[in-house]
Regions:
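N-terminal leader segment of winged-helix/HTH proteins
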Residues: 1-25, 72
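Hydrophobic/aromatic residues within well-ordered alpha-helical segments
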Residues: 10, 14, 96, 100-104
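N-terminal helix-turn-helix DNA-binding core of bacterial DNA-binding proteins
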Residues: 17-58
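Canonical helix-turn-helix DNA-binding module
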Residues: 42-86
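Basic, amphipathic "hinge/linker" alpha-helix immediately C-terminal to the N-terminal HTH DNA-binding motif
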Residues: 79-100
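Conserved small/polar residues in nucleotide/adenosyl-binding loops
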Residues: 106-112
């Protein structure tokens, strides 16, 4: 039972961190992780994004749409197969993820003392 309580505390800590992250960057953790994935791999399909983030295809589609609406990623049509769709960071998306990666997160609370 003690392990279950620790898992609950980890879940709460992540939820608190995400709330602060959203306030700071106007991005959910999944949106931030999508930007990180595209920084590491500049051209990914929606299926590759789903696999990289461990999301269902349905959730990935919603996530992509949300980040596209924020103009942080762009669609690229495949050169060989015009039916193939790739996603990459826009200049604004690159700027955003570099800001996120270089900022110190000491101001965002992750209450590890409960773990």
């Amino acid at each position: 039972m003690e392990d279950l309580c620790k898992i609950r505390d980890v879940y709460r800590a992540i939820a608190e961190f995400e709330t602060q992250f959203i306030q700071q960057y106007n991005l959910s953790l999944n949106e931030g992780m999508l930007l990180c994935a595209l920084l590491d791999n500049p051209r990914l399909t929606s299926g590759e994004i789903a696999e990289a983030l461990g999301l269902t295809h349905s959730n990935t589609s919603k996530l992509i749409r949300s980040v596209e609406e924020k103009k942080l990623i762009a669609r690229i049509i495949g050169k060989v197969d015009k039916r193939q769709m790739y996603f990459s960071l826009t200049a604004e998306g690159k700027e955003q993820i570099h800001t996120i990666k270089t900022v110190s997160y000491t101001h965002l609370t992750l209450p590890t003392n409960r773990l």
